[in-house]
Amino acid sequence: MNLFRSKPKPQPPPKVPSDEVIPLHYLDDQFYTRALVLHFFSRFDDVLDPEKLRSALDRLLQIGGWRKLGARLRLNDAGGLEYHVPAEYTAERPPFSFTRVNTGISIEDHYIARRIPRNSSGSQKPVLFEDAANFSDLIYSPDTPTKLEDWLYTDKPPLFLHIVTFTDATVVGFSWSHTLLDAMGRHLLQRAWTAVLEGREQDVPPFRGYHEDPITPVIDQTPPEQYVLYDHLLRGFGFLMFVMYMILEFVWWPRQSSRIILLPGPYIQNLRQQALQDLQEQQQKSETNEPAPFVSEGDIIFAWLAKKTLQALGTNPSTPVNLTLILNLRGNSALASAFPPGEAYIGNASLASTTLTTAREILHQPLSQTAARIRRDLEIQRTPENIRACLSLHRREVRSTGRSPLFGPGNQLMLSLSNWHRGRFFEQDFSAAAVADGVRKGGGDDSDSDRPLKTTPTRAEQIGRPSFVGVTGHENGFRVRNAGPCLGRDARGDWWVSWALRDEAWGDFL
């Protein structure tokens, strides 16, 4: 009887002596990066040549330090993650996994792909679409990893490219562990991939941080106590209270889902113009010589999401609220030596900007005030002094508690946005792989492959650029709720967001 025999502990593949072993950089080996597997996808209303895309990515991962993106992921004896970079890539150990499906039908005849969101009706108001997870069968192959262990105990490469072709469109799926890269790292990879695709290898930037972690020298330059939010650090009993509230949230409302949200360009532009006007009038009434606060579309979108989320949840006005905005470190003067211009750092390089407020302020004050607070806190917290102090605090807290620092009271409600607009994912240019455009009804089959490629009045995006981008993923060990990414702005000027809530709240969101 073996009823009580435990499963044997999984074992990694045998070490390959010729592999180069490189420990993961500090921000790459964190609890949340280990927990998240991302599946990014793009719909192109053109027929793309999968082999051209595959061969360009394959060539990129043979160039200099870019080879590191094909490294195998392993645990060392101390429990830390490390890369094992093959001395050479072969058919048995490729730099990435590639799968393709040729459906032979129009995208409008495919039971899943035809539901990929579009603003086909020209809506001028926000619209909710289904969860991107519903497209999983289209985005990645069954062999694609969904958790870190799927890499640790196999010899699978880090990147998985899955391409589905139709007679008039193409869907490109791209999967990876968050330990490999963040959103802006994905953007830099995208640009280098396009350069190779277009025959511009000379434009592929040098790979930054192959061996050494460029961020590590900056850590501990400034004492953690100098961080502007240090006195609001969540710890001790406050942190235990925060965890208890999170547990109760998932006990009472165990089901959650994400929705893709369309925010029409004119709608967001009107909200922003009204906010700027409100702030200008407020500034004039204050009789100071300071300029009126600036707010971006991203600030407006986060403020709008916060208000809609609190309304949908029926949040008590007295509830403290933490608005967390993911902060990209590339380009910050505090890390000028870490990220020299012209070089590509692909790994994780993000912290967070935090706005501490209340549900009452978000629900009852004009949108302009919340957006201005988000912008003000971002500007303060990304100064060189605060970035250096936050990095020092981050490492101190990870070493002492095993988690990233959080700020605010224990009974707070936390909302988090990652703005991917700077990644320009809607501007990804695969035109060099385009065989035929598929904008016309019935177009895009083999007989049309020699027709001229051109943008027509029925489409806004240029040839070889996506009409939609989206993301889904697998969360292991924790769940992301009241959070998500702003996917960016499409060629029509419309904004797209993926947002996660408890299921019961979606009926009251809009």
Task: Enumerate the language-model features and the residues they cover.
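Non-catalytic N-terminal regions of enzymes
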Residues: 1-221, 273, 297-317, 416-420, ...
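Acyl/amide activation-and-transfer machinery of modular secondary-metabolite enzymes
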Residues: 33-42, 80-119, 252-258, 329-373
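Hydrophobic "lid/gating" helix adjacent to the active-site nucleophile
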Residues: 65, 283-338
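Short Gly/Pro-enriched turn/cap motifs at secondary-structure boundaries
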Residues: 150-153, 251-252, 405-407
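Flexible, P/S/T/G-rich "lid" or insertion loops adjacent to the active sites of thioester-utilizing
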Residues: 225-292
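Eukaryotic cytosolic low-complexity regulatory segments
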Residues: 241-244, 375, 379-382, 386-393, ...
